[in-house]
Amino acid sequence: MKIRPLGDRVVIKKIEAEETTKSGIVLPGSAKEKPQEAEIVAVGPGGVIDGKEIKMEVKVGDRVLFSKYAGNEVKIDGVEYTILRQDDILAIIE
């Protein structure tokens, strides 16, 4: 199934945090931080919001950092994605 976000929304797939610390300690699921790094899976067309034209600055395949509690989580074909607005993306990782 293909997903096509509307407006200035993007669909991301979170990149899970490491399960082992640098010193080799294995973290249980409850101790891991909520992931804030993701890969862009789909990008909306942009559009006009509050009278301002919104140009999409991200593209499919970009790795990004996003606000920890941003967006709506959805499950499609057994895979978890998050749909959020471009404004919730903090940076592109190059």
From Swiss-Prot:
Keyword Lipid biosynthesis listed = no
**CDD domains reported in the protein's UniProt record:** cpn10
* Gene3D superfamilies, sorted: GroES chaperonin (2.30.33.40)
| Gene Ontology molecular function, alphabetical | ATP binding; metal ion binding; protein folding chaperone; protein-folding chaperone binding; unfolded protein binding
SUPFAM superfamilies, alphabetically?
A: GroES-like
Reading the lineage from the top rank, the first entry is Bacteria
GO cellular component terms attached to this protein's record: cytoplasm
Subcellular location field:
Cytoplasm
Its GO biological process annotations read: chaperone cofactor-dependent protein refolding
Q: Which UniProt keywords apply?
A: Chaperone, Cytoplasm
- Record protein name field: Co-chaperonin GroES
Q: Report the source organism.
A: Clostridium kluyveri (strain ATCC 8527 / DSM 555 / NBRC 12016 / NCIMB 10680 / K1)
Taxonomy of the source species: Bacteria, Bacillati, Bacillota, Clostridia, Eubacteriales
